[in-house]
């Protein structure tokens, strides 16, 4: 599909994922809301249509280029805490909140947007050490042990390998967890 059709599909998805019933519960359960993945050549407007779609739907948008992150900034930093199991005390490792998840909460407080899109750009260019974290993120909507807030949709974008030498092909496990939208270059839709 072209970028204009992709934008319309994104808007439909945002409306479907943010719709609630009379009890203020999501019409589509959060566990069934698959992240959107826009895959297409660089420069065709994938990021721009995310901005346009979020504005059209009145939801927030927080964008991250994942290649700028390390495993620690995505998952959080380890810290030692004391826990008692049975009658014995242990020192165990837990993780601080991810910089990315923390930014969503800060954005919500700053803007008042309780619903939004967490947009991860260049998702298929992550380092090898971050790839398992991205798989967990796509499946469970978590970075480390912290979850993306309810009401927030996950969307991502990437480029096919012929456009970027650092692309890591997404495996079937990752592709099975997303709603893939192939976006083709179509100059005519910009005229």
Task: Describe the residue ranges of each PLM region.
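AAA+ P-loop NTPase catalytic core and its hallmark functional loops
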Residues: 1-191
